[in-house]
Amino acid sequence: MAATPDKGKALELALAQIDKQYGKGSVMRLGDETRAPIEVIPTGSISLDVALGIGGLPRGRIVEVYGPESSGKTSVALHAVANAQKLGGTAAFIDAEHALDPEYAKAIGVDTDSLLVSQPDTGEQALEIADMLIRSGALDIIVIDSVAALVPRAEIEGEMGDSHVGLQARLMSQALRKLTSALYNAKTTAIFINQLREKVGVMFGSPETTTGGKALKFYSSVRLDVRRIETLKDGSDAVGNRTRVKVVKNKVAPPFKQAEFDIIYGIGISREGSLIDMGVEQGIIRKSGAWYTYEGDQLGQGKENARKFMRENPDVANEIEKRIKEKLGIGAQVDAETADPAPVDF
């Protein structure tokens, strides 16, 4: 039904009043202008960037990373922090678990000298600090590790056996209502690391659930389920884990894709290993028996030798990464060591 001239005029007056009161762009027609592509922060694994559909974690959104203990949740978050810093951004880490290892963070590539770290006493303090940092508009990424450790003040000050049903869920719900718009306006990515619990008496379906109530599930634009699927060994010594990440929720691209990559102890996600896996899958790297070749040049016999060759020849790794991203249409290469810092828009 077409709008009458009177209705159209009334609407224009209302829109003018809204723009005057709340700022230009507060209300707009969906077809007026094309939306800018979603800005991203690379994860450090090209296979995970591809699974996310846009080339990394979306800026201005909430991301939940959950999984069993020692599955690689913090490693994934720290790689995102390192990549944000390489792009010239500022990062913060709310260490509610008081378990951040600075040496491991540095090995992953995090600039620990400029990383903002807080070890709060209560959940309220943690979320208030996060809110103030986000509203400053100067932050590109913030990690909260973990939701389970955001203990409400009443629980800390109470007796050990006291019942505090639903306190943490209410705290999270209230905080996320405040944080969502602030994150969007500041283009800050918030990564909430979460733990798994088991629901008692579940007969059908998965008994696993995450802590902190249901609010985080709703407010998250991306939810990543991180699982360790295999132990990597050098002879009889364990040197790392094979990790599978499933994108169980994705508001910015099709969900339910998954990625596999290696996490090497003391080093983090093997970028070269991910490039080899994706290169073979996309036909950019040729695998014949145990040998890997690229453009007729041998990378090595066996994955470990190919990985070592690419680590020693970063130009080859960067070229392969660029070709994979161009073929899959997920944006430019951004996490090369030699890349110039990109300007940061707030």
From Swiss-Prot:
InterPro entries: AAA+_ATPase, DNA_recomb/repair_RecA, DNA_recomb/repair_RecA_CS, P-loop_NTPase, RecA-like_C, RecA-like_N, RecA_ATP-bd, RecA_C_sf. ATP binds at G67, P68, E69, S70, S71, G72, K73, T74. PROSITE patterns: RECA_1, RECA_2, RECA_3. GO terms for molecular function: ATP binding; ATP hydrolysis activity; ATP-dependent DNA damage sensor activity; damaged DNA binding; single-stranded DNA binding. Its main location: cytoplasm. Keywords: ATP-binding, Cytoplasm, DNA damage, DNA recombination, DNA repair, DNA-binding, Nucleotide-binding, SOS response. It is found in: Cytoplasm. One of its GO terms (biological process) is DNA repair. The keyword GTP-binding does not apply. GO terms for cellular component: cytosol. Pfam families: RecA, RecA_C. CDD domains: RecA. Belongs to the RecA family. PANTHER family: MITOCHONDRIAL DNA REPAIR PROTEIN RECA HOMOLOG-RELATED (PTHR45900:SF1), RECA (PTHR45900). Can catalyze the hydrolysis of ATP in the presence of single-stranded DNA, the ATP-dependent uptake of single-stranded DNA by duplex DNA, and the ATP-dependent hybridization of homologous single-stranded DNAs. It interacts with LexA causing its activation and leading to its autocatalytic cleavage. This is Protein RecA. The lineage of its organism: Bacteria, Bacillati, Actinomycetota, Actinomycetes, Pseudonocardiales.
